[in-house]
Amino acid sequence: MPGVIPSESNGLSRGSPSKKNRLSLKFFQKKETKRALDFTDSQENEEKTSEYRGSEIDQVVPAAQSSPVSCEKRENLLPFVGLNNLGNTCYLNSILQVLYFCPGFKTGVKHLFNIISRKKEALKDDSNQKDKGSCKEESLASYELICSLQSLIISVEQLQASFLLNPEKYTDELATQPRRLLNTLRELNPMYEGFLQHDAQEVLQCILGNIQETCQLLKKEEIKNLAELSGKVEEQSLQKEETGGITSTEIDSMRNTEDVKEQLPKGNWKRKSDSESSNVKKKVKLSRESQPLEENQRQTRSKRKAIGDTLEAAPKIIPKCVSESESAKPSQKKSKVKINWLKPSTKQPSILSKFCSLGKITTNQRSKGQPKEKEGDVEEDLEKYGSDHTANGGPESPGSSVTPVDSSEAKSGNKGAEQIGFELVEKLFQGQLVLRTRCLECESLTERREDFQDISVPVQEDELSKVEESSEISPEPKTEMKTLRWAISQFASVERIVGEDKYFCENCHHYTEAERSLLFDKMPEVITIHLKCFAASGLEFDCYGGGLSKINTPLLTPLKLSLEEWSTKPTNDSYGLFAVVMHSGITISSGHYTASVKVTDLNSLELDEGNFVVDQMCELGKPEPLTEEQARGTAGNYDDEVSIRVGGNAQPSKVLNKKNVEGIGLLGGQKSKADYELYNKASNPDKVVGTPFTDNRNSETNDTTNGTHESDRNKESSDQTGVNMNGLENKISYVVQSLKEYEGKWLLFDDSEVKVTEEKDFLNSLSPSTSPTSTPYLLFYKKL
């Protein structure tokens, strides 16, 4: 029966799988539980898992492995401050870095900030501030951009100085946040709200345009204040001439004019108020004084009347004169006509011509003597106002060439600072173009001038698109490398007007053929060249960017440039490249912006002594929101990773990385704190820095009781201040020497990261041999 045994075994094998499966599952489960409890199992899989778990533990627990990395980061840190990305704000960070290193920009912003801070203090001291508050809010809002720029400049300089003096405190990064400036831009232009990518050239035009408007507003306010002061002084002189008597208001005005004269340099002429100073004591006997007063006055209609009639009519004439002078404020020509009967037959200049040519009129009035004494009073007060406001940074009248000998040098020095301040954009970035049209028949020329702040040049020929459509083999045919001079020649090319677009000549009196050219008439200190790297493309349509795709055609860019070929007059000016804004990406609404800046002019570097105070004072004096509460208040609902420096007595190297987990929409970025509140807190950082020193001095004086101890302490404090001044000078010289190591080197600013770029690598990225995605977008040349 051997054949039956295999059949039984087969039958068992058929019915056994279910049983074996049950047994095998239970067996494997028991085996896994044993593996979990048995620590002496030496299988290969267990060894692998133990090694993997051990590696995980080794990566987390020891801190010694991460220390070499931090040391390398500390060595790689450069003494240049980056800017944190606050959510697709690389377009703003790159422009701010270029403006920071732009020659003369920081000086002009500081000058404007000092003027604005003085104006704000004047508004606080004004008794009628409540009545004028509504009309001053708009001007303060327009001043906020200047205050935000100055606040950012101060924070960058202080952080740079702190790093150079204490480099061991900074291990992670050396960067600050332009949050206040970003909030100001969002207030001025709601387009920058949210976290969308924007054009770097547009934000540059927005910043420069608002600075220019602020400068014009400051000019108008200074001229208005000067006109109001001249009107008030003129009213006082007219009241004296009309009434012939002395009232309480005249006594106050005479005292004010006497105080004014004491402050001014003395001349060889006398004022009428000096001869009448004795009459102030005898103001009770008006009837006896009326006769000598009328003899000293000019020939007016009031002299023909009797003495009693004059005294009775005096109080009636005063309000009439005041009303006429008040109504004459809007138009100065009318005031000249109405008040002409009070003056002699000689022609009197208008008020506007007075404060436009103060020196000339003042010298003429002094030579004529007593008949022009009242006008001399007006000119004296106007001279005082002009000198005070010029010394304080206010506008100086263009015609004030003849000045007192003592203040001529001061005015000439302040005039240059005033021009840099009020004409910051015009001097640095704004030039003038001439559109010249020449008739081909009569050879007559017509010119039209317009201002420009940047030059937009092409990077490829217009016919290239037609070639791409006709070519079937290669979508990007190889073309010869274009240069920047070729691009500028395309911008200033001669255009021939023919056919239906003929030019109507005024000399020929009919339509003729003409040539139109664009030339440079006035060149600024800094030339901004905008490369038109984005063009409309139907094949690669970008719904967010409006169909603008990137043109990656390389353009040969020189380090030195001369525009004499396209200028209206011969010039020897040459420009050197000092900054480039690069764009990497394929569309205008995406990608990333970086800035490359060449460090130059460190020998003429001017550092503020307020940036080299003690760390505690430095932290208290920073106008940027540096504490956690202020940063959270200004951050609002930002969903990005930012670094916050702890204020107070903490070290500035402590960096806290915070991230909000609240969900926000595409157009988020709402602000919880208004910009003017930040302006009120940090409009004058010098005062904030100075307050701890004053508190220490007051505490020291309160501890002493005797005068001798106070004098000793004053001597010690004076010695300490001398030592501190020497220490500040040593710190400043050390910082300057440390920065001179980077003279002539190119720095790459990639938001918060700063790197040194070799000149060869920079030239390769500037004029690449291939067509990379990272190409130059904005070129900045400064006058050499």
From Swiss-Prot:
GO terms, molecular function: cysteine-type deubiquitinase activity; cysteine-type endopeptidase activity
The USP domain, residue ranges? 81-784
Positions modified as Phosphoserine? S16, S42, S67, S474, S767
Entry's Gene Ontology cellular component terms: nucleoplasm; nucleus
Mainly resides where? nucleus
Active site positions? C90 (nucleophile), H592 (proton acceptor)
Stretches for region Disordered = 1-21, 34-56, 233-342, 362-414, 684-725
Q: How does it assemble?
A: Interacts with FANCD2 and PCNA. Interacts with WDR48. Interacts with ATAD5; the interaction regulates USP1-mediated PCNA deubiquitination.
State the function annotated in the UniProt record. Negative regulator of DNA damage repair which specifically deubiquitinates monoubiquitinated FANCD2. Also involved in PCNA-mediated translesion synthesis (TLS) by deubiquitinating monoubiquitinated PCNA. Has almost no deubiquitinating activity by itself and requires the interaction with WDR48 to have a high activity.
Full protein name: Ubiquitin carboxyl-terminal hydrolase 1
Organism (species): Mus musculus
Could you tell me the gene encoding this protein?
Usp1
